C-alpha cells in the first residue's frame, strides 16, 4: 500500500511537471499606433482560458499561456480592440500597436476599465486621463490635475481654490507625489491657487488612497503617480493655449522616426508683463508731480517640462526627463524726502527641479528591469532689505533678513517585473536615497554708524540623511475567484548617527462573487521619515520639510479597508469602501509657535508630538463612456488628532475634517464640436478655533508713589478651552463650462468658456470674531466671514496642430 502511495505521488509530480512544461510565455509591449506612446495599464486577455494581465508603467506585458491555439484580446480605453488567434509552440514576442478609436472622440475615461477594477486586487485607486481634466470647469479656466482629483471621494481640497489635497484624513506631507518616478515636494503655483503640473505635458495620472503595493513607501496617506508624455515618434505635433492667468505651448515629435522622440512643454503667467507699463506710467506721473516715490510689484510663475526617449533595440529603451518650475514675487518701494531716502525691497520665491534618467531592459520573456537615477530639489526663500540714508547728517543704515529652506534628493533605484507563471506577477527592487535638508535657515545682517554690525545665521545649513529600501510583492491567483497581492517593504533611515528601520507588510485581496462583482479587503503598514511643519500663522509657502532625528521619531501608520466593486454592463461602475487609519508620531507647532520663532531656537524645540485617528465610508458611481460621462462621489468621514500639550490632551478634529463631502461631475457631448461640463460640490464646514471667553485687562497700568502710570487702555485677553471648537458654514458651489471645437485643415481650435461658483454662493474663505456696540452701548461679539471666490467667469483659447 505504501509503494502504491509513492507511485501515485511520483505520477502526480510527473503529471504536474508535464503540465507546467506545456505552457509558453507571450510578452511584448503595447503602444499607440499613431504616436508610439506606451499604453500604461493596457489589458491583455486570453479568451480561451479566461486569464489576463495588464501592461506595466512602460507598456510591457508578460502572460503564461498553454501550447496550441489561443485567442488573445488587447484593449485600452478609447482605442480599438484588437483580437487575434495565435498558435503557440514556444515563447513568443507580440508587440501591439493599438489605433485610437476615432468614433470615440466623445468618450472620456475617468478611471480604468470597469471590468479591470472588478478583477484586480487594487483598492482606493483612481486613474485620470488628460481628456478628463480638460473637460472639468475650474477656477479661472486653468485645467488642473490636482483640482480634478479633489472631486474624488476621500480627497479633501483644504482651503478654497488651493492645489493642496488631503487624503483620508492625512496631511499634505503624507502624499507621495511622483513625476516620472521623482518626488515633488511642493505642488503649488500662485500661492496655492494652481498646481505645478501642466496637464498638456501629462500622459497618465494614478492616485492610490489605500491598499498600497509594497513597491511604494515613504508616505502614509496616498501615492500620486504622474507620468509625462514620451513624445510622438511618428510625426510632429503641437498644442498651445491662452488663458486668463497663463499661456502654454507644447511640442513633440520624432528625432529619428520610430526610434527617438521628444516632448517639450512650457507655461508662464503674464501679470508682470501686463502690469509693467501701468506701473511705469504711475511712477513717471509721481515724479512729474514732484512726488519722489517709486513702487514696483511683480509676480510670475513658470514651468518647463522636457522628455526624450530612445529605443536602443527591441529589448532596451532609455528615457531622460526634466521638470523645472518657479514662482517669484517682489515688491520694491523707494521714496525720498528732502535729504532722506528710504528703500524697501521684499522678495518671495519658491520652486522645484526634478530629473530622471531611466533605462528599460527586457531581460527575458518573463523578466523586465528598470533602472532609474533621479534628482529632486525644492527651494523656498524670502528676504526683506531696508536701506536708509540721510545726506544732511551723513548717516546711513541697512537691515537685511533672509529666510530659506531646501530639500534635495539624489536617488538610485532598480525595479524588476517577473512572471514565473500565469497565476503570479512578481515585482521586487531596491533603492538608495541621499537627502539633504536645510530646514529653516535665517540670515540677518544689520549695519549702521552707531551700532555694532550684525551678521548671523540661524538654523541647519545642511543636514544630510540616507534612506534605503528593499521590497517584494506578488499578485497571485489562488483560484478563479480569489486573488491576493502580498508583499513586504523594508526601509532604513540614517541621520546624525541615528538609524531607524521598518518592516512593513502589505496585503490586499479580492474575491469574485460574480464576473461583474467583487469584494475586497486590505491591510497596510507605512512609515514616513520626513515631516512637514505647516505654518500656523498665514498662507505663504513657509511650510518646512524636516527629517526624523534623535528627538523626533518617524511617522507611523496602519490602515485597513474593506469594499466592493460592481460593473453594470461596462457602462456603470459602483464602488464602496470603508477604511480605518491610525497615525502615530505626528508633529505640529506648539501653541502660538511659527517658523518666525526659528531665529532663537532649533525647530525641534518648537514642536509637539501626537497621534491621529481617521475612518470613514466612500461611495463612487462612475459612467466612463458615452455622450454623458462623469461620476458621483460621497464621503462620510471623521479625522481626529490627539496631542498631550494641546487641548489638555483631549481629542479635537483635524483642521480639514469634513463630515460629509459630495461631488457630482458630468460632461455631455452635444455634438462632435461642442461639449458641456458641470461640477457641483457640497461639504461640511471645516473646524476652526474660537475663544470661548474674553477678559479686559489693564496690562500696561501700574501704580507707583501713589500715582497711576501707563495708558490704562484695556487689552482683550482670550481664553481657548478647546482647539477647533467651531465650524465654518457649510460649503457648496456650482461650476459650469463649455468647449467649442473647430477643425480646420490639420489643426483643431477650441474656445472654452465657463463660470466658477455660477450661483454666486458666498463661501467662507476664513472667519473672524468682530466686536460690535449697538445704540444702547451694549457690546456683543459676532462672527464675520470673508468670501473671496464669488461668481468668476473665465475664457480660454487653444489650438492643436
Placement of each model-derived feature along the sequence:
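Short acidic/polar hinge/loop motifs at secondary-structure boundaries
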Residues: 62-64, 135-137, 182-209
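Transmembrane beta-barrel wall of Gram-negative outer-membrane proteins
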Residues: 245-269, 287-331, 350-371, 420-421
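C-terminal beta-signal and adjacent terminal beta-strands/loops
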Residues: 274-277, 673, 681-714, 729-735, ...
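Surface-exposed extracellular loop regions of Gram-negative outer-membrane beta-barrel proteins
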Residues: 328, 379-381, 443-444, 449, ...
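Gram-negative outer-membrane beta-barrel transporters
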Residues: 580-582, 605-690
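A beta-strand signature from Gram-negative outer-membrane beta-barrel systems
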Residues: 96, 151-152, 196-235, 248, ...
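Outer membrane beta-barrel strand-and-loop segments of large Gram-negative receptors
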Residues: 409-413, 458-464, 469, 553, ...
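Short, acidic, small-residue-rich periplasmic hinge/interaction motif at the N-terminus
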Residues: 31-35, 42-47, 75-79, 89-137, ...
Amino acid at each position: 500500500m505504501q509503494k502504491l502511495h509513492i507511485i501515485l505521488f511520483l505520477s502526480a509530480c510527473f503529471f504536474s511537471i508535464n503540465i507546467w512544461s506545456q505552457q509558453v510565455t507571450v510578452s511584448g509591449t503595447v503602444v499607440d499606433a499613431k504616436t508610439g506612446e506606451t499604453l500604461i495599464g493596457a489589458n491583455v486577455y486570453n479568451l480561451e482560458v479566461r486569464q489576463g494581465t495588464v501592461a506595466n508603467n512602460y507598456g510591457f506585458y508578460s502572460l503564461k499561456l498553454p501550447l496550441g491555439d489561443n485567442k488573445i484580446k488587447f484593449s485600452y480605453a478609447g482605442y480599438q480592440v484588437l483580437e487575434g488567434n495565435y498558435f503557440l509552440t514556444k515563447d513568443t514576442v507580440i508587440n501591439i500597436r493599438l489605433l485610437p478609436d476615432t468614433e470615440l472622440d466623445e468618450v472620456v475615461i475617468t478611471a480604468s476599465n470597469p471590468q479591470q477594477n472588478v478583477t484586480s486586487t487594487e483598492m482606493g485607486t483612481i486613474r485620470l486621463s488628460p481628456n478628463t481634466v480638460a473637460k472639468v470647469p475650474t477656477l479661472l479656466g486653468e485645467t488642473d490635475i490636482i483640482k480634478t482629483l479633489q472631486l474624488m471621494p476621500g480627497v479633501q481640497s483644504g482651503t478654497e481654490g488651493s492645489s493642496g489635497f488631503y487624503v483620508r484624513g492625512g496631511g499634505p506631507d503624507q502624499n507621495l507625489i511622483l513625476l516620472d518616478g521623482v518626488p515633488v515636494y511642493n505642488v503649488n503655483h500662485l500661492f496655492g491657487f494652481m498646481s505645478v503640473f501642466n496637464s498638456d505635458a501629462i500622459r497618465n495620472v494614478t492616485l492610490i488612497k489605500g491598499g498600497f503595493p509594497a513597491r511604494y513607501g515613504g508616505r502614509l496617506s496616498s501615492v500620486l503617480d504622474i507620468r509625462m508624455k514620451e513624445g510622438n515618434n511618428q510625426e510632429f505635433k503641437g498644442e498651445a493655449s491662452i488663458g486668463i492667468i497663463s499661456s502654454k505651448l507644447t511640442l513633440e515629435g520624432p528625432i529619428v522616426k520610430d526610434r527617438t522622440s521628444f516632448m517639450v512643454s512650457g507655461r508662464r503667467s503674464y501679470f508682470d508683463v501686463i502690469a509693467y507699463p501701468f506701473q511705469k506710467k504711475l511712477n513717471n506721473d509721481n515724479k512729474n508731480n514732484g512726488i519722489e516715490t517709486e513702487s514696483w510689484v511683480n509676480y510670475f510663475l513658470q514651468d518647463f517640462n522636457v522628455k526624450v526617449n530612445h529605443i536602443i533595440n527591441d529589448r532596451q529603451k532609455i528615457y531622460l526627463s526634466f521638470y523645472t518650475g518657479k514662482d517669484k514675487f517682489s515688491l520694491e518701494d523707494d521714496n525720498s524726502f528732502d535729504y532722506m531716502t528710504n528703500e524697501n525691497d521684499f522678495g518671495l520665491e519658491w520652486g522645484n527641479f526634478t530629473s530622471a534618467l531611466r533605462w528599460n531592459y527586457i531581460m527575458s520573456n518573463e523578466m523586465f528591469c528598470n533602472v532609474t537615477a533621479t534628482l529632486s530639489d525644492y527651494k523656498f526663500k524670502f528676504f526683506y532689505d531696508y536701506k536708509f540714508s540721510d545726506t544732511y547728517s551723513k548717516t546711513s543704515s541697512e537691515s537685511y533678513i533672509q529666510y530659506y529652506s531646501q530639500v534635495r534628493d539624489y536617488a538610485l533605484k532598480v525595479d524588476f517585473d517577473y512572471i514565473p507563471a500565469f497565476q503570479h506577477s512578481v515585482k521586487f527592487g531596491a533603492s538608495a536615497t541621499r537627502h539633504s535638508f536645510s530646514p529653516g535657515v535665517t540670515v540677518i545682517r544689520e549695519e549702521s554708524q552707531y551700532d555694532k554690525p550684525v551678521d548671523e545665521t540661524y538654523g541647519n545649513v545642511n543636514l544630510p540623511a540616507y534612506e534605503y529600501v528593499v521590497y517584494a510583492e506578488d499578485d497571485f491567483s489562488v483560484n478563479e475567484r480569489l486573488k491576493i497581492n502580498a508583499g513586504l517593504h523594508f526601509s532604513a533611515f540614517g541621520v546624525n548617527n541615528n538609524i531607524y528601520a521598518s518592516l512593513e507588510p502589505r496585503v490586499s485581496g479580492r474575491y469574485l462573487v460574480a464576473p461583474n462583482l467583487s469584494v475586497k479587503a486590505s491591510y497596510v503598514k507605512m512609515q514616513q521619515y520626513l515631516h512637514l511643519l505647516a505654518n500656523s500663522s498665514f498662507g505663504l509657502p513657509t511650510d518646512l520639510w524636516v527629517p526624523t532625528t534623535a528627538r523626533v521619531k518617524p511617522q507611523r501608520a496602519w490602515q485597513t479597508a474593506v469594499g466592493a466593486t460592481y460593473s453594470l454592463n461596462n457602462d456603470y461602475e459602483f464602488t464602496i469602501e470603508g477604511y480605518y487609519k491610525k497615525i502615530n508620531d505626528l508633529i505640529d507647532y506648539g501653541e502660538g509657535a511659527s517658523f518666525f520663532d526659528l531665529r532663537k531656537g532649533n525647530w525641534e524645540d518648537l514642536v509637539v508630538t501626537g497621534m491621529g485617528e481617521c475612518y470613514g465610508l466612500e461611495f463612487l458611481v462612475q459612467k466612463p463612456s458615452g455622450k454623458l460621462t462623469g461620476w458621483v462621489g460621497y464621503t462620510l468621514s471623521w479625522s481626529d488628532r490627539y496631542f498631550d500639550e494641546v487641548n489638555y490632551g483631549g481629542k479635537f478634529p483635524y483642521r480639514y475634517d469634513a463630515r460629509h463631502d459630495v461631488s457630482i461631475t458630468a460632461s455631455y457631448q452635444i455634438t462632435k464640436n461642442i461639449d458641456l461640463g458641470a461640477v457641483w460640490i457640497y461639504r461640511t464646514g471645516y473646524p476652526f478655533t474660537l475663544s470661548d471667553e474674553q477678559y479686559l485687562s489693564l496690562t500696561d497700568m501700574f501704580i507707583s508713589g501713589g500715582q497711576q502710570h501707563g495708558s490704562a487702555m484695556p487689552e482683550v485677553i482670550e481664553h481657548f478651552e478647546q482647539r477647533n471648537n467651531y465650524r465654518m458654514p457649510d460649503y457648496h458651489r456650482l461650476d459650469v463650462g463649455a468647449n467649442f471645437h473647430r477643425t480646420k485643415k490639420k489643426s483643431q481650435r477650441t474656445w472654452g468658456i465657463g463660470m466658477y461658483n455660477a450661483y454666486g454662493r458666498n463661501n467662507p474663505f476664513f472667519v473672524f470674531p468682530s466686536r460690535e456696540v449697538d445704540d444702547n452701548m451694549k457690546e456683543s461679539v459676532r462672527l464675520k466671514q470673508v468670501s473671496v471666490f464669488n461668481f468668476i467667469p473665465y475664457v480660454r483659447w487653444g489650438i492643436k496642430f
